[in-house]
Design a protein with these regions (language model features):
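Conserved catalytic or metal-liganding residues and their short signature motifs at active sites
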Residues: 1-157, 164-167
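C-terminal soluble interaction/assembly domains
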Residues: 165-181
Length: 181
């Protein structure tokens, strides 16, 4: 669970715990899904503002390989956040980025660097692996398939890339779905 410094400060100053909400943003959630989850759990949370901040008007991000000004999709860290019920969209985005930075500090990117991958590349590949693998045991195999296809310059041709391009998640893809370019 991610407990923001602001929340801790509020508790200390107030002398009692203010009203909070526990909001879980699961791995693999899109920006749209995350905005709906925040809005569902936080009264008055403006999902459209969250999408605008994280999608069209993102803050400066300190991630190697990330092109400033592009969507934060894939960078907003999935976790359970304990937040004030008055949380605003800009603060939600900041909390998720702080969680990303904190977790990236723990990751050894040595092999990625040897393969000329940026931190952003690794995050995108990890997102695809997370979306594609049904169980944890499949992750290394899925990662190997993705890596081999990238190395050979082949199209990925995995469900995760198609699901991302679709407006809504589908449990079962159709032949029409996989024809997407």
């Amino acid at each position: 669970m991610v407990l923001g410094r602001t929340l801790l400060r509020e508790w200390l100053l107030a002398g009692e715990a203010p009203e909070t909400a526990s909001v879980t943003i699961p791995e693999g959630f899109t920006l749209e899904q995350a905005s709906r989850r925040w809005a569902k759990e936080i009264d008055g949370f403006d999902a459209a503002t969250y999408r605008r901040i994280a999608g069209d008007d993102p803050p400066v991000v300190d991630v190697d390989g990330y092109k400033q000004g592009t969507t934060l999709e894939g960078l907003l860290f999935p976790a359970t956040y304990e937040v004030l019920r008055t949380l605003k969209p800009r603060r939600a985005v900041k909390l998720q980025l702080e969680a990303l930075y904190g977790n990236l500090e723990k990751v050894d990117l040595g092999r990625a660097r040897e393969a000329n991958l940026t931190t952003y590349d690794v995050l995108i590949i990890a997102s695809l692996v997370e979306r594609e693998a049904r169980v944890a045991e499949e992750r290394p195999l899925v990662a190997a398939v993705i890596w081999n296809r990238l190395r050979e310059g082949m199209p990925l041709q995995i469900d995760a890339t198609i699901q991302y391009a679709l407006p809504e998640y589908k449990e079962q893809l159709t032949f029409d779905d996989i024809e997407i370019d």
